[in-house]
Amino acid sequence: MSPDIQSNNRISIQVSLSGYSFKVLAPDGAVVSASASWLGPGTVFTTPELQRRYVGAEIALMTPKFALVPSAFLLPGEEREALADVCDLAPGDEVRVCDVPQFGARLVYSLSVGETLSKVIAQSLSAAEVLPEIWYLLRALADVPEYNRIVASHADGRLYLAIAQGKTLLLANSYPAPDFTTAEYYLFLAVKRLQINPEASAVWFRTPLGPAEERSLYR
């Protein structure tokens, strides 16, 4: 049995309307294998990494339908109203909620974005739970060693962004960004408005970046 088939590995998958990306992780967090770029939906049944079994699977869906609310302010039964205040909801959109204890908040969200790929992948991975990408961005902030922490993703013309200083969350939002240049604009605009020193900050992207995008980001 090869190392990347062992049951103690985990897989992390990001899904959008246009496709998906993945990383296979060893128990120590080291990347065993990963997609070099965004993959089309038609490759789901032929990608070897998606045909294997893992000790754990994480599936993140790119959905702009979310609201982060302080736990004390979100009363039972008010989840849909809280989400409708910040995004457009169709009558049939399912609204869910999960805890974000590290920031004393609850994340209200909807996975109803007109795709079925996340469900197909989840079923192939023993019904793994699908959570919004912003939930994983918020969790990833703790992995950034610098005091100024910035974690982002860019897919399907949208930037997802979370920023914190130490243990204090400053921003969790998404922005329309049809290209990476626009994504950078919103990223650096947020940094400027929050009065964060970009030279003393770390920017982590969860979505794959091409060489040109990496050069542009860190120039």
Model-identified regions with their sequence ranges:
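Glycine-rich phosphate-binding loop of actin/hexokinase-like ATP-binding domains
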Residues: 77-84, 169-177
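Short glycine-rich phosphate-binding loop at a beta-alpha junction
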Residues: 12-14, 53-67, 198-209
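Residues that cap or initiate secondary-structure elements
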Residues: 28, 65, 167, 209-211
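Active-site neighborhood for divalent-cation/phosphate handling
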Residues: 20-142
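Accessory, usually C-terminal, subdomains that scaffold auxiliary metal cofactors
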Residues: 97, 109, 170, 174-219
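Gly/Thr-rich phosphate-binding beta-strand-loop-beta motif of the actin/hexokinase/Hsp70
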Residues: 1-31, 141-169
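Short active-site oxyanion
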Residues: 10, 105-106, 149, 201-203
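Short hydrophobic alpha-helical module
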Residues: 123-127, 164-167, 190-193
